[in-house]
Each structure stands twice: as structure tokens, then as C-alpha cells.
UniProtKB/Swiss-Prot annotation:
It comes from Pseudomonas aeruginosa (strain ATCC 15692 / DSM 22644 / CIP 104116 / JCM 14847 / LMG 12228 / 1C / PRS 101 / PAO1). The lineage of its organism: Bacteria, Pseudomonadati, Pseudomonadota, Gammaproteobacteria, Pseudomonadales. Disulfide bonds: none annotated. Residues 34-54, 223-273 are annotated as: Disordered. Belongs to the universal ribosomal protein uL2 family. This is Large ribosomal subunit protein uL2. SUPFAM superfamilies: Nucleic acid-binding proteins, Translation proteins SH3-like domain. The keyword Transcription does not apply. The gene is rplB. GO terms for biological process: cytoplasmic translation.
């Protein structure tokens, strides 16, 4: 994997920094694991905007990724590692011994030809999946379930991982990248290693158009709007907001805690930094 800084042959190329991976599959994705992905433009079924800054962008197919890794005891060969437009991580196409193929989140260091396996007796090796109670303390893991059998929910994006720091009774304690220490049921599954494409954070799109290709529309500042559109709007000439930062609906933003799931508060040993 190489970091390529483009020559400034035009204004749109001047600030482009690419992450080039020659090992990624250059052909089409595996068709039986594709699904149609329609664009909403950020609108709900009434046609009203429920999420701002969404619209346009290149057409995409959704790749059906196996987040459960529940095909136990059957070895699989990594056929190839692919780009996935729906996530920052790469995905790997596995071919199991019984002929079935599945996509998984590609772990760091896993390449075509490697053998992976899931289950209680799986070797301690990057890319293998098993319950947390079978993983040694101190191991780095990703693709962690919060409920047994529900599928991976934590540490799924590029370069993400967590560390298993303790095991006590029916729970294990994980240290997340945010600094949060959290208890998770030991029966939940996780995959060893960290997620691939950790260089994703080093890239620079270089121009506004590259963001538009990804289906993201511009974000207008509140102070640049009229009073009818935003609490920060209006005033003669350039003005400060005149109040603490709020959302377009007047709710406090920038630093206000938004977590509301009190039912699982007792699972958090230490808050994130």
C-alpha cells in the first residue's frame, strides 16, 4: 500500500492524496452477493428531508457482508480482497470448503490465498472469529458483537480495533479506540486482529467534487443564513452567532452529550476521553 501525492497539474489535483493498494481485486464484485441500493436524497417516505447534506453521487451496489461469522468449523480460503464503496474498510471474499462464498470485513494483513476459520476451536490468528471467552486477554480484536448472534457492531471501520483487557464471570472488558472501557458478554463473537485500510485517514479528496461523487452535499453555516432558516442567521454584515452554538432547531450542539440509552449505562466501566 502506497501514499501518492498528485502533482498540481490543475487546481483540482493540487491537494489530492491517494492511498493506492495494488493487491485489491481489479475486476467486478461477486454478483450473487450484490443487492440494489437506491438513493433517498435524505428524504423519508413523505418526501421531507430528514437528513441534511445527502444527495447525488455515483451509483452503487450494496455488498452483502457476513457480520455474524457463524459458519463454524468449515475452513475458508480468501479468494480476493476488494474495494467496497459502502464502507471505509476493504472486504474479503471467502470461499468455504463446501463451496459457499461470503464477504467479510477484511482484517489487516489478510491476503488472497490465506485460510480462515470460525468457531470455538479456531487458532489464535488474525481473521479467525470466535466467542470472546476463547480469546486470550491482551488480544486485539474487531467486528465485536454486543448481543450474541446479532452480528458485529463495534470496530468495523478502516483501521478500527479494540483490546480485550479483562475477563470476569460472564463478561469481558474491552478498551475501545475512543478510550472507553466497556463490558460485553463473553458469548459474543469477535474477529482477531484489526480492520484493514488503516491508511484511509491519510487520504485527501482534494476538491469539493470528489465529496459530491460520494453523495455528500455542501454544509452551509448557520451564520450565513437568514433568521428564518437558522437561530444564528441574520444581522447586518458579518456577525458572530451571538449565542452558544445550536442546531437549526435550537438544540445545543458542540459538546452536549447525546447518549440516551440508560439501560446499558452499567456496561460502561469508564467513559470515553
Amino acid at each position: 500500500m502506497a501514499i501518492v501525492k498528485c502533482k498540481p497539474t490543475s487546481a483540482g489535483r493540487r491537494f489530492v492524496v491517494k492511498v493506492v493498494n495494488q493487491e485489491l481485486h481489479k475486476g467486478a464484485p461477486y454478483a450473487p452477493l450484490l443487492e440494489k441500493k437506491s438513493k433517498s436524497g435524505g428524504r423519508n417516505n413523505n418526501g421531507r428531508i430528514t437528513t441534511r447534506h445527502i444527495g447525488g453521487g455515483h451509483k452503487q451496489h450494496y455488498r452483502l457482508v457476513d457480520f455474524r461469522r457463524n459458519k463454524d468449523g468449515i475452513p475458508a480460503i480468501v479468494e480476493r480482497v476488494e474495494y467496497d464503496p459502502n464502507r471505509t474498510a476493504h472486504i474479503a471474499l471467502l470461499k468455504y470448503a463446501d463451496g459457499e462464498r461470503r464477504y467479510i470485513i477484511a482484517p489487516k494483513g489478510v491476503a488472497a490465498g490465506d485460510q480462515l476459520i470460525s468457531g470455538i476451536g479456531a487458532p489464535i490468528k488474525a481473521g479467525n472469529s470466535m466467542p470472546l471467552r476463547n480469546i486470550p486477554v491482551g488480544s486485539t480484536v474487531h467486528g465485536i458483537e454486543l448481543k450474541p448472534g446479532k452480528g458485529a457492531q463495534i470496530a468495523r471501520s478502516a483501521g478500527a480495533s479494540a483490546q480485550l483487557v479483562a475477563r470476569e464471570g460472564a463478561y469481558v472488558t474491552l478498551r475501545l479506540r475512543s478510550g472507553e472501557m466497556r463490558k460485553v458478554l463473553a458469548e459474543c463473537r469477535a474477529t482477531l486482529g484489526e480492520v484493514s485500510n488503516s491508511e484511509h485517514s491519510l487520504r485527501s479528496l482534494g476538491k469539493a467534487g470528489a465529496t459530491r461523487w460520494r453523495g455528500v452535499r455542501p454544509t452551509v453555516r448557520g451564520v450565513a443564513m437568514n433568521p428564518v432558516d437558522h437561530p444564528h442567521g441574520g444581522g447586518e454584515g458579518r456577525t458572530s452567532a451571538g449565542r452558544h452554538p445550536v442546531s437549526p432547531w435550537g438544540l445545543q450542539t458542540k459538546g452536549k452529550k447525546t447518549r440516551s440509552n440508560k439501560r446499558t449505562d452499567n456496561m460502561i466501566v469508564r467513559r470515553r476521553k
